Amino acid sequence: MAAAGLALQRYLLLLAQEHLEFRLPEITSLLSLCGGQFSSQQEVCVNSPFWILNIPSEEMARGLMRRTVCAKSIFELWGHGRSAGELYASLKNYPTDKMLPYLQPDSTYKIHIHTFNKTLTQAQKIKKIDALEFLPFSGKVNLKNPEHIFWILEDYGMDPNNVPEEPFDLYFGRWIADGQRELIESYSIKKRHFIGNTSMDACLSFIMANHGRVKPNDIVYDPFVGTGGLLISSAHFGAYVCGTGIDYNTIHGLGKASRKNQKWRGPDENIRANLRQYGLEKYYLDALVSDSSRPIWRKGTLFDAIITDPPYGIREATRRTGSQKESVKSSERSTENHIIISSSYHLSDIFFDLLKFAAEYLVMGGRLVYWLPIYRPEYTEEIVPRHPCLKLISNCEQMLSSHTSRRLITMEKVKEFKDQDQNSYLSDGQYMPYKGHNSFREKYFSGVTKRIAKEEKDNQK
């Protein structure tokens, strides 16, 4: 990680042990947003909750923690070892002049112990704290409201069935800041005013905004807006948000409710009300009834980020306006005098249209973040849709079942859109897994049917 003229300081990042594949792209994206750069020299074990990062300044470390939902805390690393002896030797080699500002006689402090994959007794904790008496602490201990908090962190490995007596790694550092994990609870869809069948989990919603490097005063667009869950996380970070959807009832908050024990939506159940619930209404631009396959926007770059979750045909239908002779027409009332005719929308066409739209309407350096449904037995990296104007940044998997998953794809616009890119259909081979309406849907439910049949057979034995 580089920042011109700045010496790099080592920091310890403590991460939450969920959504493991999503953590590195989130931290990398946020560091670049803060003006840093993630280098291959970082001391990172992808599945470990402890990462050592080289960051130019404490302010950049704080900036990272003001955004991340994957990390719990960050510490200025004073010592690290594979044994207690190595840790103490490392601490003795840490420059005293860097320690002293936090060890003054008129300051207060406390020491906290955190262990991963093992629980220590209070006596064991006290013994470990007493072993640090060689450090020049001269302030007073204050357990309730200290000025400085120091942490001993111990890693006992990833196997809960084989916990070692001694830790594999030990760390000591000064606490700098906590991440934004509390947002997962405060924005939980359980408490949200307006939800749908496919409302995005709050944690994943914030991860998507971070992968998209959403920042204050950006304009963020969701072409499959649904109930607007993805707009909320972007608005929380200060972006102005808008979206479109083909379902008139959802956009206007009409029709049947998705919430249990509620038949119809209330008079104030809509996207705007969701943003109002969180004090974010000022960031709401609009939500329009529109077909994503037929863009309504004027030509030119309009959006800093496009963050979306296209329909897969499982809980929400894949539809677009128009009609097909071979398909059964469905009508949806939009105004008193106009009926929208919708037809099937192939998954291959959804992703082709989405990438083409992003290439044309994203600003240079803007990001597209979307979910790609995958039938795992057939998955290869080659089937991830590409576009000549978009660079693939990250590809993270979330399991849905033993045979299906979805992948969070993040792409960045690196080339200006030209007329010749209008129909840049990438090789047909990339889209073959999605050919035919709801091919993913059929494979998803074929797996469910097979599992049910197997369970019934096992029960008969």
UniProtKB/Swiss-Prot annotation:
Functional summary from the UniProt entry: Catalytic subunit of the TRMT11-TRM112 methyltransferase complex, that specifically mediates the S-adenosyl-L-methionine-dependent N(2)-methylation of guanosine nucleotide at position 10 (m2G10) in tRNAs. This is one of the major tRNA (guanine-N(2))-methyltransferases.
Any single GO CC term annotated in Swiss-Prot or TrEMBL for this entry: cytoplasm
Record bears the keyword Secreted: no
Pfam families (alphabetical): UPF0020
InterPro entries, alphabetized: DNA_methylase_N6_adenine_CS, RlmKL-like_Mtase, SAM-dependent_MTases_sf, tRNA_mtfrase_TRM11
Transmembrane annotation, as ranges: none
GO biological process per UniProt: methylation; tRNA processing
Protein name: tRNA (guanine(10)-N(2))-methyltransferase TRMT11
Record text on subunit structure and interactions: Part of the heterodimeric TRMT11-TRM112 methyltransferase complex; this complex forms an active tRNA methyltransferase, where TRMT112 acts as an activator of the catalytic subunit TRMT11.
